[in-house]
A protein has these predicted regions:
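SDR active-site strand-loop-helix element
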Residues: 1, 37-43, 99-101
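NAD(P)H-binding glycine-rich loop region in Rossmannoid oxidoreductase-like domains
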Residues: 1-17
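Glycine-rich NAD(P)-binding loop of the Rossmann-fold in SDR/ketoreductase-type enzymes
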Residues: 13-24, 76-77, 179
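Catalytic helix-loop patch of NAD(P)-dependent Rossmann-fold dehydrogenases
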Residues: 16, 52-96
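Hydrophobic positions on the long internal alpha-helix
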Residues: 21, 25-29, 84-85, 187, ...
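Conserved Rossmann-fold NAD(P)-dependent oxidoreductase catalytic core, especially the SDR/UDP-sugar
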Residues: 23-71
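Glycine/proline-rich active-site loop of Rossmann-fold NAD(P)-dependent oxidoreductases
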Residues: 91-94, 106-127, 138, 150-154, ...
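C-terminal substrate-binding subdomain of Rossmann-fold SDR/epimerase-dehydratase oxidoreductases
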Residues: 171, 175-260
């Protein structure tokens, strides 16, 4: 059990359930000789999506080594959860994989109802951005980022963004990542079967981005100031999924299939 988003609990409640309960679970495993655990972390362990203090990511594709800059209780709780796993790997020889699940985490029926309309409207906005000059598109993203950061820092203020713009920025700050619930469960099973030494975070995302766009174009339009460190291929994810592939996991459900 955990509180999955900041709005569902007070900062203290989020920390108590997400962190203290995790510590107790690890301690119980240590007391009873259990030496392998799979932890439900989140793509938000980096702090990009919910953070009250806005920042830009260092590079794309985002991988497990990207620095964490958490400034909200939920993201911080996931950062601490991963630190708890590292602590018990060091002190009790408990091996663990901390699965950083991407956006989605619902059944196909729920995703079709809630996510698909957002994706369709996001594609319309992307089409308009693509028709602008590179300078104008970058200026538009800077404007959206400014207001999005302001919204998170001052949640009681009236937003200067439209509902569709807020939705697009939400997708952006989850790196246009996606994972369906049953696929996430399959990743957990594979992680339990995979023997590792120590503790590692691992992104669990579909290998394709949610908008099913050429990744190079998506990165240029939506992250014009971010360094791209590896060549993108077709509609691939902006989040590196190779560590998950190393345990035999590759998502069989893409966000694009929800629309078909």
């Amino acid at each position: 059990a955990a509180i999955p988003v900041p709005r569902l609990g007070t900062p203290a409640a989020i920390f108590d359930l997400n962190c203290a309960a995790t510590f107790r679970l690890f301690q119980a495993c240590a007391d009873h000789g259990i030496d392998q655990i799979v932890v439900a972390s989140s793509i938000n362990a980096i702090g990009y999506h919910f953070g009250r203090l806005g920042f830009e990511i260092d590079y794309l594709p985002v991988d497990e080594e990207h620095p964490k800059t958490t400034s909200d209780p939920y993201s911080f709780s996931k950062q601490v959860t991963e630190d708890i796993a590292t602590y018990f790997a060091r002190t009790a020889n408990i091996n663990s994989l901390c699965l950083r699940f991407g956006a989605g985490l619902q059944s196909l029926s729920m995703l079709r109802e809630g996510l698909v309309p957002k994706l369709l409207r996001a594609r319309e906005q992307m089409d308009r951005l693509a028709q602008m000059s590179a300078t104008a598109a970058a200026d538009q993203i800077r404007r959206l980022r400014h207001h999005h950061d302001d919204d998170r820092q001052h949640p009681d203020k009236e937003s200067q963004l439209t509902a569709d713009e807020r939705s697009l920025m939400g997708l952006r700050h989850n790196f246009f990542s996606f994972i369906e619930l049953a696929e996430a469960c399959r990743a957990i099973r594979l992680a339990l079967m995979h023997k590792i030494v120590g503790s590692q975070p691992m992104f669990v995302v579909d290998s394709r981005n949610t908008l099913n766009m050429p990744a190079q174009v998506l990165a240029q339009l939506m992250y014009p100031e971010v360094v791209v460190r590896a060549e993108f291929s077709e509609n691939q994810s902006l989040v590196d999924w190779q560590r998950a592939r190393s345990i035999g996991f590759e998502s069989q459900v893409a966000a694009a299939e929800l629309i078909d």
